[in-house]
Swiss-Prot record:
Keyword Oxidoreductase: yes
Protein name: Malate dehydrogenase
Catalyzed reaction equations: (S)-malate + NAD(+) = oxaloacetate + NADH + H(+)
Organism: Akkermansia muciniphila (strain ATCC BAA-835 / DSM 22959 / JCM 33894 / BCRC 81048 / CCUG 64013 / CIP 107961 / Muc)
NCBIfam families, A to Z: MalateDH-SF1, PRK05442.1
Gene Ontology terms, MF aspect: L-malate dehydrogenase (NAD+) activity
Keywords attached to this entry: NAD, Oxidoreductase, Tricarboxylic acid cycle
Binding-site list for substrate: 92, 98, 131, 162
Biological processes annotated in GO: malate metabolic process; tricarboxylic acid cycle
Pfam family, one: Ldh_1_C
Length: 329
């Protein structure tokens, strides 16, 4: 039997985690023969609710689950963690400015970054799902002294999946036909779903979908505004689709990317495509056969794409500047 992998999930009694934990426990994320230790972090007022989730996890009797540790202590939660899925964050409430949200969450992610540095495994990898995820990841990364910056990721796979779904529907094909879909920038309404480099059935999207006006207009805005549309329709934010995207992200990071394809995840910029070094920005990324990752290089960026990328990167800079006092320089 393989050695168990320790997976820490924060915000473990929340809606996204409720969908996510059962996918992890079933083997969807790390494979059908990989045992898992689950370490679940919550704030003290949510510990009763978390106990209920733990009861359900136990009642499902998943063969792959080796142990389950619910806790409100970050050091206990991150002890020996190989994967940290930082799902918990304070949601934006009516009348709250984005800056307020950045500040409140900033304090949470400082503490989690420090606890990861103290307690996690040497090979730890950290995926931030809780919004604003790019800047939350930046704060955690800056405060996780000794943990390499290439271990920190923020999730834009939900945006990629939404974009693929829209393109497939428009083209009248199965979603698996859509490949090479890059999301650039921030996981926010400024993100840029890049149809110019995407493919449908191996052909450039623009050869399959001739409606350029739709591609440059409704397609982009639908993907950018999808989260808000779901809240309006459902009365609650997207939880199951976010959990599914987190599973997809970890699976993509953990397995070699098929030749010629890529996936989207926000990583610490190395200056590629003129995007300022040090920002946590979404790029097209590939996982290499040695288990590392790399930003896909040499993609054409036309004037339309450049304008869209610059706009979302500017928002990332503004967010970074708003939390600069929380970053270790």
């Amino acid at each position: 039997m393989k050695t168990p992998i320790t997976v820490t999930v924060t915000g473990a009694a929340g809606q996204i985690a409720y969908s996510l934990l059962f996918r992890i426990a079933s083997g969807s994320m790390l494979g059908p023969d990989q045992p898992i230790n689950l370490r679940l972090l919550e704030i003290p007022p949510a510990m009763n609710a978390l106990e209920g989730v733990v009861m359900e996890l136990r009642d499902a009797a998943f063969p792959l689950v080796n142990e389950i540790v619910p806790t409100s202590d970050p050091d206990e939660a991150f002890a020996g963690a190989n994967w940290c899925l930082l799902v918990g964050s304070v949601p934006r409430k009516a009348g709250m400015e984005r800056k307020d949200l950045l500040d409140i969450n900033g304090k949470v992610f400082i503490g989690q970054g420090q606890a990861i540095a103290r307690s996690a495994a040497k090979d730890v990898r950290v995926l931030v799902v809780g919004n604003p995820c790019n800047t939350n990841a930046l704060i955690a990364m800056h405060n996780a002294s000794g943990v390499p910056s290439d271990r920190f990721f923020a999730m834009t796979r939900l945006d990629e999946n939404r974009a693929k779904s829209q393109l497939a529907e428009k083209a009248g094909v199965h979603v698996t036909e859509v490949t090479n879909m890059a999301i650039w920038g921030n996981h926010s309404s400024t993100q840029y779903p890049d149809f110019t480099n995407a493919r449908i059935g191996g052909k450039p999207v623009t050869e399959v979908i001739k409606d350029t006006e739709w591609l440059k207009g409704d397609f982009i805005t639908t993907v950018q505004q999808r989260g808000a549309a779901i809240i309006k329709a459902r009365g609650a934010s997207s939880a199951a689709s976010a959990a599914s995207a987190a599973v997809d992200t970890v699976r993509s990071l953990a397995t070699q990317t098929p030749e010629g394809d890529w996936y989207s995840v926000a990583v610490c910029s190395d200056g590629s495509y003129g995007i300022e070094k040090g920002l946590i920005c979404s790029f097209p990324v590939r996982t290499t056969k040695d288990g590392g990752w790399e930003i896909v290089q040499g993609l054409p960026v036309d004037a339309f794409s450049r304008e869209k990328i610059d706009a979302t990167v500017n928002e990332l800079k503004e967010e970074r500047d708003a939390v600069s006092s929380l970053l270790k320089h």
